Amino acid sequence: MAIVTVDFDGTLYKGDSFKIMFQIAKKEYTRKDWVPVTVGLGKAGISGIINGKNAFKKEFFKAFAKGFRGKTKQEMDTFFEKLVDLGKKEVHTELIDRIKEHQSNGDTIILLSGALQPFLEAFVKEVALKDIHIISTTLTYYPNGVCTGELGNIVNGEGKVAEVQKWIMRAKKEGLISNEELNEIWAYADSETDIPLFHLADHPVVVNPTPAMKQVAVNNAWSLF
């Protein structure tokens, strides 16, 4: 028995969930929705110049989410269902099979991603994966069920390690995982931002690697998938 973390973009999903989200938004967003996004994009550009590419991505993600402000939970669910319908052809079917193998061995599966949680929930349902724990970026809602347009903590890089460790502590306290599972952690992911997670894992597995990431895997004697 083990804990198995699986990244989403570029790993379980071969594409980029933000790109397809942007495609849907171009059809669904009104001019009013785009106003805060455009303002936020300017701030993201400044952040990118000062702090680099990853900082730009995070700020743009936050800006984009502001276009969701005022939408109901039902409207958001419909939006993410359209995302899944557009992106489902990019699912990594071989990795789906590997996940099911892990489950047959009694392993605990965590889908760990910076992607939005409602999208991942819809995706997992579409590909018929069951008993999956999801740690990802959340959208916040007002008590009346209307989206605030604000994100929770963006789960990326070192943040993934912190979130997994918090989840493990909570799950152990609640009796959801055994001490035996804590002795074996797997990590399936694809990018350089996942290197901290790979170092946490007993079994790092680099999925769909770029040439540069493949070399990193070889240098560290990590498995390839």
Question: In which residue ranges do the predicted regions lie?
Answer:
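Short, surface-exposed helix-loop/turn micro-motifs enriched in polar/charged residues
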Residues: 13, 56, 111-112
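Amphipathic alpha-helical interaction elements
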Residues: 26, 65-69, 125, 205
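Catalytic cores of large soluble enzymes that bind and process phosphate-bearing ligands
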Residues: 13, 68, 156
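Active-site neighborhood of HAD-like aspartate-dependent phosphohydrolases
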Residues: 1-52
